[in-house]
Amino acid sequence: MTTISLRKSNTRLPPEVNRVLYVRNLPFNITSEEMYDIFGKYGAIRQIRIGCDKATKGTAFVVYEDIYDAKNAVDHLSGFNVANRYLIVLYYQHAKMSKKFDQKKSEDEITKLQEKYGVSTKDK
């Protein structure tokens, strides 16, 4: 089913579908231009961010202008072979990407730093 027929049939998309894709298992030496060549075939791209430090190398975020283009890319590029590596293309999900943190611990750390540097957030 093409992107145009998806739009015309007023197909409802699953809730996890969004314009931002998270791509894993990329070759470490892939360039932005190569990413645009691969992902641009499925629609207009707003932004591509490739991981460059030790922890994020081999990953990227691809942001499409249109949600249907993103769905089409996921459908066609999951498992796509690039330099003998099979891409893992997922929809970005904020809850899964962000680390859970202890709010009380964070507030305690902020309080300690405020005391250390003499900073107050209270109105005088």
Curated annotation (Swiss-Prot):
The lineage of its organism: Eukaryota, Viridiplantae, Streptophyta, Embryophyta, Tracheophyta. This is Splicing factor 3B subunit 6-like protein. It is found in: Nucleus. Residues 19-94 form the RRM domain. GO terms for biological process: mRNA processing; RNA splicing. Pfam families: RRM_1 (PF00076). Signal peptide: none annotated. Disulfide bonds: none annotated.
